[in-house]
Structure formats: C-alpha cells, structure tokens
C-alpha cells in the first residue's frame, strides 16, 4: 500500500486524494484521447506550453523519467504514462515543441490557452503544473518535477 503525498506547490489546484476529472482531448494527430483509456496505469498529467521557458527546461528530465519508468509496475498501477496537456493557442508551435523536446508520449491540447476547459477543471493557474494519478484515476501527488518525480515513482515502484 502507498500513501498520498502533496509537495509544496505554487499551483493551488485540485487536492491530493480527489478523483481526477475525466476528459477527452485531441492529440497531435487529431485523434481523441480519453483519460479513461489510461486506467490501470500510473499517469502524470503534465500541464505545459511551448512558450513556457520553465516547462521547456523541464523537458529533458521528463523524457528521462518516462524512459526509465514507462514499463515498470507500481503500487496502484502497472506502467507509467504521461499525458502532456499544452496550454497553447498556436497549435503549430505546440506540435513543433513536442517534436523538438522529444515527447514520445500522449500530447493533447484544446488550443485555447487559459480559456481551455481542462485548465478550469484541473484548477491550473500557473505553469508548469502536474498531477500524478493512480491506476483508478485518483490524484496521489501533484507538482512533482525533476528529482522529486523520480523519487516519488521510485517509492511506489513494486520491488
């Protein structure tokens, strides 16, 4: 069994322990992506934007973490996935940034910047922001970056 942890966050957002709001968003290829399709996995919902310098600086760490943990089993889920949600209004800039930063996981956007419903549903008011979900879609941690994300995943990994 694992415990939920909330790390200090600049983003008030949804509380740890709450069920993550469901969504259907369009990916870089125009295909609808549902949060529900990721049930059973540990999922990082990563809010970012192509214009966010701090987000882009975080990209190499996120790529390494994904490569390290994507096929591992965890308490509360099998496998690790990332759904990156871009808070961009220019979809070409968003798609270019996905390629430039080497994001091989699911990337979605409403193309409405801060007017996006997903930003309201997840109470995101600053970037970068993220939520870590268990296999049932419950928020188990939030705003984990770099070594904090890696360390948290290591603690919930099945040994």
Task: Describe the role of every protein-language-model region.
Residues 2-36, 158:
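N-terminal "domain-start" segment that seeds a small globular fold
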Residues 127, 132-159:
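Thiol-/selenol-based redox modules, centered on thioredoxin-like
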Residues 26, 83, 95-131, 135:
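Short, internal strand/loop/helix patches
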Residues 72-79:
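Intrinsically disordered, low-complexity Ser/Thr- and acidic-rich flexible linkers and loops
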Residues 42-43, 80, 128:
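Alpha/beta-hydrolase fold active-site loops
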Residues 46, 81-86:
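Short beta-strand segments
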Residues 39-40, 47-68:
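Conserved redox-active cysteine motifs that mediate thiol-disulfide chemistry
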